[in-house]
Amino acid sequence: MLSFNKGIEEQKNMTYKDIKHNEEVNELLKKGNRNLGLLGYTDHSQAHCVRVAETAAHILKKFGYPEHDIELARIAGYMHDIGNAINRSRHAEYGGLLANEILKQYDLSIPDRITIVSAISNHDESTGGAVDPISAALIIGDKTDVRRSRVREKPKATFDIHDRVNYAVTDQTLKINAEKKVISLNLQIDTDICSMYEYFEIFLQRMLMCRGAADMLGATFKLTANGAKVL
């Protein structure tokens, strides 16, 4: 399979390791996560960003994309939530603007920088969508990160619907079938904590965004909850 950014694989570019050790990126992520904690949101820490980066990379690797594109997905995945340091509203666009300036510090081609910035800017379901394979993999990595450990430590009596939905997920697996071109998210949800209705009230738009992202990759997105096919 040809690289998404054809002809630039030979250039010496920055790496995922470089961006993970970038002080400005990490301070933006820490500040954004602290802000969201005070506003009552679930965890958006570096652990979430690493998970998104690795999932995005795994998806592209399974579908045969070159290492160059996989590395771009890792970088975009790690940086995708830096805009939360400015404001949660339109954080994707803020993140893209911040990333553009940070990436100018590196020996990175203009097409690669724009690809990363575009993926970050389009990852939020309220304003964006998949525009290329890098952004598609990032979206799926981000929107499928539903797990109990993303709920911050607080009394259960104070949980809002977002807390309950994440806390109710007792098991989550994302499977990639490259041969059949299928991306499957399988969830186990404790319905004593959160009803199926509540889950889909919060996550339906995100799951539909995953379906669009899978389509960009020439694949089908399937969602199973408690053994029942949903999408």
Which role does the model predict for each range below?
Residues 2-91:
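Acidic/His-rich, divalent-metal-binding segments that scaffold phosphate/diphosphate chemistry
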Residues 3-6, 10, 145-231:
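Terminal helices and disordered tails flanking the catalytic cores of nucleotide-processing hydrolases
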Residues 23-30, 111-114, 132, 201-204, ...:
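Generic alpha-helical secondary structure signal
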Residues 37-38, 48, 61-176:
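Divalent metal-dependent catalytic cores for phosphoryl transfer on phosphate-bearing substrates
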Residues 41-44, 129, 202:
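Non-transmembrane, amphipathic alpha-helical segments
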Residues 56, 137, 210:
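Aromatic/hydrophobic pocket-lining residues that form π-stacking "cages" and hydrophobic walls in ligand
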